[in-house]
């Protein structure tokens, strides 16, 4: 995977209790969650088309959104490459998160695709089990 150009987000990490942040933008751990490089705008467009039914046939989307329990409280139920996050205000967000050194991301939106959000945090080690939930709650309470 290559990060093209220079106008892109940068990823940072702290290692072994060091106080100094290290730029790890170009490190590659060799796992699948670092294999897709995109822009927030493209991720929002993708989820808008997916969740509005413009990308897949109705039956395919229905199957994708059919979930099974994961046993992981932060994720809840998981479909085919997508999971539902139920916010405290009752809004359900469908999307997916990923992480690689220096980056934690989430992209998704509401069914119908009218409201989507892509989030990037510069660092993948957080003390919060779901670092996106408060951001999602703020955005999807509007």
Describe the role of every protein-language-model region.
Residues 1-11, 15:
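Active-site helix/loop module of the DD-peptidase/beta-lactamase fold
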